Amino acid sequence: MSHTADIPLEAPTLLKLASSSVQSQINNDEYMETVILPVPLSQELFARFRNKWNIHNHGPAPVEHLGPPTDEPRPDQGNIDMIKQVFRIWSDSTRLPLEKLNLTGATVDDQIFVDLLHAHAHSITELDLTNVTGVTDLSNAYLYARSTHFPMLTSIRMTSMDLVTGHQPRRKNGIASTEFRALFMLGEEALAEARGQMERDGLRSPLSPSSQPSSIQSDHQSLDALVPCDSPVEPPLITARAPNVKRLFLPRCPAKRTTIDEEEQNTHVILTKILSPLQQLEVLDLSYWSKTDDMRCLQPLSNTLTCLILYDVPDLYHAVPNICHMTELRILDVSQSNRDSGLYPHPVTTLNKLIVSLKYLTHLDISSTNLATQPSSHDNPARYRESVRTDICGLQSLVRPLKYLGLFNCESASHVREIPAEVVSGDANEDQVITSLQMYKDRAGLLQNVLNESYQLYRFGNSNPLTRHTEALHLVLEAMHRHLADSTLQIAGSASLFYIIRKVDMNRDTKRRVVSALLSGMEVHMEEQVMVRNCCLSLCQFEIPQDILFDYSRLAVLLVSVLQHHNADNLTQRIVVFLLNSMACHVEGDQKVQVGSYGAIEMILDQIARKHTANVCDDVMEVGWSFLWNITDETPVNCELFLNANGLDLFQKCYEAFKTERELVRNMMGLIGNIAEVDELRSQLMKDDYVKIFCALLESQEESIEISYNSAGVLAHMVSDGEEVWKQMTVCRNEVMQRIVEATSSWKLATRRFINYRSFRPILRLLPLYHAYASQHWAVWALANLTTTDGEKYCAYVRDEGGVPLLEELVSNAITTTDIRTLANTVLENIRNVENKRNPKSIPADLAHSSNSPTFVPSYVSDVEEEDEGDVEADEEVQDFVNVDFDDYALPMEY
């Protein structure tokens, strides 16, 4: 399979390193009150905190409390407090100057917001208030009271309209909106009361006499609290305080595009009030506005405006004449998210009129409209000029090809042969889809459809070879990051990722980004079965657990949660159990304890119990027991969790129901073996029913010795506890020991094992137990077998873990049985052969027999025993249900 190279890794810049160092001192008041930073470092540090509060914002939105106030803190109170702290620190512009003030995603109040703006009023050139909450039209009054102006500000971006629409008082039903006579307005006395209340609450009021404009300060007339007012004074909007703004981005929130204020006040009046102070405006974004009528409010900007973005503004056919008067336009975007709102009565004529009128146009987006449709008998304008080759009739009057043309979701327009543009967004080929991902990354409505096209493209391919997987990967990741709360978009993105990541040689950072995106999507949309399945399928393409160790705990918690929420979806269950089993392999005890602490053992047992009740033995059950085997390996805490959850009862039930399922029985006995190795827990196995099962399995050697070997190991540990603990049993201990020896003697010493030991300590502890000759026999056979079949690996384990002296003691002790002595000599001979092979001249024979050699445990030896990585057949069985047929399950969305 061919792969595309990932983007190169980049070392952190000095600026990032420096900002990281300063960030660590944020709670050091003495440091933060004295530090002085240059603008670039102050900007970078502020951006770090912005990223931090936006990460917290990805959690569930706080539910608005109804009724009287309570003392309970908001769920996001910690994040709000952090934002306030950051705003207060940066309100000292002398030490922490800012030129670009980006407050995206912040939750603030008017007071602290105005403090920050006022501090940097004379230096900021860009102001970004995207998704800022808590700011109201009261901020305009505060700015007015403090005479704050922004002479350097050239760019404003915001999604909340309060700062630009001003206060719109709601009227009672039946009162005309133009009737203001005999209305009452609070006067100075009421203002003084409000100021006193604010100061009692610990807030500094910007409306105190010392901070008011001189005209207000000089007004000492005694006014009643309520006085008739024919012309109430309204504070100027923020645009009136920044007359040099050239770029104004005012996209409304799609979910709140129709508000009461908008219904009560003509949109033309609102926009005129916003735009009239901006005599130098060049770029204007009014995306998602509605009821814009003919947009005559744009006429005063006809000589300056070069970019007009009207994405998802409905019924734009009313505004075409006024748009055509904007003759300086270079960029025009009239695209829609839905075709229904982008229908023009005479589309070909309309597009032709725009092209003829806007002679400087270089970028045009008409996605999800009918403007690129073919002409009809009543809609076929005459060609104004013949300059370009095009199969789109409405563009025939172009003087030169466009630099960019948006044609996504314009029926088949992006598939025609002649398109007069250098770059095109559409769905005809990979280049068009990549361009669409780039252009519509902020537009959820269009982006969802683009991601669906991406899914189709990278799953089924195209007539041309696909070569831009890496770009697609990073664009899809960005889309999922920007629109985490949109479940349909997350589903489409996760499905695309499934097919893209298999063709990219991802570097470390990209792997982390992909895993984080999948986990975040799954975390926020846990109830969406398709989303959860897509994410789990994509995770199966990573090396588990290596690629997820950086977020190991989070994934474990999520997978357990998936088992709880989606226990009826068999495919999802199979994938999750496989992932959990993979996570339990090849990790150290601490991480296994973590997984156990999140309830994974209990959840897996619950799934196994469901399967048993349904009398079904499938992948979920088999891999579930494999997970339990791995998660309890050398981890007594997890063994105890298994026992406390009545795991032994379930073991007995599953054995009785499915005793012919060899893989299942093998996994179950591996788990029981882990429990048998724990001295404090082994007594719970001392029941006649369990011992009879273990003894019966000693003779199970149909395909391999694994089940018989595991059963003998369990019994070997049980009989090692001595005669006393067996007195309560009806099964005779001596008879059990004899059966262990008989089973062990029947195994072929050269049998290759499907087990991967990383420590021999549990086995070596049985060697000195002369009161339990069967335990010795099983232990020494295991050592002889492993050092014979894989001496290069296991001889070092015996020597380094102190096994040589124990074996020599067995050989020399008179009460050792002949078979045990023979096996012990075999192990010692294997060790000598391996050592001589490595250093044939440097190791004298007498040293090879020495029992005084020091015991040393190397760093590569751990206390964990796990399934053999070399067990190719077993591994393929587990992998089969992950890799086969999954192409039919990763879905972009349910149509």
UniProtKB/Swiss-Prot annotation:
Domain of life of the native organism: Eukaryota
UniProt region (Disordered), positions on chain: 58-78, 195-221
Record's keyword terms, sorted: Ubl conjugation pathway
Biased composition (Low complexity): 205-220
Name of one Pfam family that matches: ZER1-like_2nd
A GO cellular component annotation in the UniProt record: Cul2-RING ubiquitin ligase complex
Keyword Cell wall biogenesis/degradation on entry: no
Assembly and interaction partners: Interacts with elc-1. Part of an E3 ubiquitin ligase complex including zer-11, cul-2 and elc-1.
UniProt function note: Acts as a target recruitment subunit in the E3 ubiquitin ligase complex zer-1-cul-2-elc-1.
Name by which UniProt lists this protein: Zyg eleven-related protein 1
